[in-house]
Amino acid sequence: MNVICYGDSNTFGYDPRSWLGDRYDPDSRWVDLLAVETGWTVRNMGQNGRKIPTFSPVLPPDTDLLILMLGTNDLLQGHSPEEAAAKLEHLLTQIPLNQNQILLIAPPPMTLGDWVPNQQIIDHSHLFAQSCQTLAQRLGIPFANAGSWNITLAYDGVHFTPQGHRAFAHRLLEVLAT
């Protein structure tokens, strides 16, 4: 099975303890853990700072599954949950795959921290997750809400800790097994 994981810094495996964009080691990143646990070919197309793009990513023709988790950076940069959901809907309708080949994951809600100075952003992340679920249902796309996975976030209130990556991988494997 050929899997593409498309997302932001939490997909990339960004280590917030680093100022230079370093990554956690492969034994800690959820994308790498997914590959090890399944034996699948899993490509990490995470990018630090990625917002929801206007156009579909270029996917290899042998892509069996696209795991997509985006929206955090849109909210951090002032977009409303509704604006982010509209951008996400546009993106999802551009992806040249069948609906059952896409897994949309709502990012875990942010917490107060160095990058999250107020409750409004946290509230927006909860509302965005609800919008993602509604959107997935409307488009017939499989959905998972990482907000229910108890993902540990770092001091910045945004990025997964190594424990958060392991928990994310564990819960994602459960979703993929169903």
Q: What is the predicted role of each segment?
A:
Residues 29, 51, 161:
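Residue-level signal for threonine
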Residues 56-178:
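Alpha-helical cap/lid subdomain in secreted, periplasmic
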Residues 1-46, 56-62, 166:
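Serine-esterase "nucleophile elbow" of acetyl-processing enzymes
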Residues 44-52, 143-148:
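Acidic carboxylate-rich catalytic motifs and surrounding loops in phosphoryl-/glycosyl-chemistry enzymes
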Residues 11, 20-21, 49, 73-76, ...:
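Short histidine/acidic/glycine/proline-rich micro-motifs that form metal-
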